[in-house]
């Protein structure tokens, strides 16, 4: 059942969409110490992510119309996953802020693209489950980061775990392109 596969992927994508949103609050004290930045630097990071999110949300309709929802979801998950992993590799705070913008670009396209797709193809009831899936993701993000900090002694490993999950999801979307376009 191709539609069932798409529904499951959509739910997993919204879980993955919520995860990064739940990581930063728990990781922030460690990130701040790592980069030796002031407390208010978090505002720059959040603003960058929000800016990317708003831009891609606003442009997602024409982009999906041109490239198709499957390609946009695959590319957006890859962008978000690469950004999350990139957070762990950058040597300076400004680069992490820039990656926050890129991550926001990916997240905004996933959110608006999937919302539109599910509303058009599955209906209102599935929209409720889609948003419940986001709740699972945003709830699991702090658990993942707490585990990374307490058992692995690194905020970076929390972002790597979620980034790898996003990259895996990008491969899932890429491998189901033909199903998304029908």
Residue ranges, per PLM feature:
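Extracytoplasmic
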Residues: 5-37, 57
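Short hydrophobic/alpha-helical segments at membrane-entry points of transmembrane helices
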Residues: 9-10, 92-100
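Residue-level signature of mid-helix packing/kink "hotspots" within the transmembrane helices
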Residues: 22, 49-58, 139
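Helix-breaking motifs and short loop linkers at transmembrane-helix boundaries and internal kinks
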Residues: 36, 68, 89-94
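Helix-to-loop junctions at the C-terminal end of transmembrane segments
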Residues: 56-69, 149
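Structural signature of the two symmetry-related core transmembrane helices
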Residues: 71-86, 94
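Cytoplasmic helix-loop-helix junction between adjacent transmembrane helices
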Residues: 99-134
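Symmetry-related core transmembrane helices of the 12-TM Major Facilitator Superfamily/SLC fold
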Residues: 157-175
